[in-house]
């Protein structure tokens, strides 16, 4: 038996060894995915007379592909067009997504496209986050994003947080690519502030979404079913890599939400 696939390996990159079954992602029994259309399995329809429609079909979301592959329960806390500010100001409360009944062992946060590209909101910095009171966070993307992390950590103190950056695309302008790069930097800074937090850095490690990728995995401006499945494999593989490279952060995942812990391991 080759045990190398179960350990951290020198020189291995996060997406070198794809895990279609999720690998160690399966250690989480509950995962909540917070995001926009790409977290919602959104498909774009187009009629003969040019009318476009946008449809969130959650069973096709990468989160539900993860649920089926890894055997986890996955919540879709998402909607097409979502921003961190709308999530905090109205959406989450209107959908009861702050309800402790939905407390999860892991949260995957995939926001930023509509905030930074669509609405041109200021990115902000980690200094926009008030550690003592999330209601005092600055009204920047960083401030709202940090508020989401703070509120879910208040619900489940020991949850593991995964922050997802945006993959590069051949159709991005230099300005858009620059915003994606800055967004990724911010996520790494947030991961240094919040304990048990890691970055799924698709900007750095995922393949560039080139013309061939669009032909295979896109339907107009959104992913097609295979594209969402592909994204699920990226996310699961990345989480598996993180767990193998930081086992001390995940030894007690089984105790999250139980009220128990083991003092001999990181908690």
Where are the language model's segments positioned?
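Solvent-exposed loop/turn segments at secondary-structure junctions
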Residues: 37-40, 79-85, 113-118, 167-171, ...
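Structural recognition of the beta-strand scaffold that forms the well-ordered cores
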Residues: 32-35, 39, 73-78, 105-110, ...
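Aromatic/hydrophobic pocket-lining residues that form the small-molecule binding cavity
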Residues: 141-145, 183-184
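Catalytic His-Asp segment of secreted/periplasmic serine-dependent ester chemistry enzymes
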Residues: 166-267
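A structural motif corresponding to the C-terminal end of an alpha-helix
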Residues: 65-73, 147-162, 186-200, 242
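Serine-esterase "nucleophile elbow" of acetyl-processing enzymes
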Residues: 2-78, 97, 192, 248
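Active-site segments of SGNH/GDSL-like serine hydrolases
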Residues: 114, 148-182
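Conserved SGNH/GDSL esterase-like catalytic core that processes O-acyl groups on lipids
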Residues: 44-139, 143
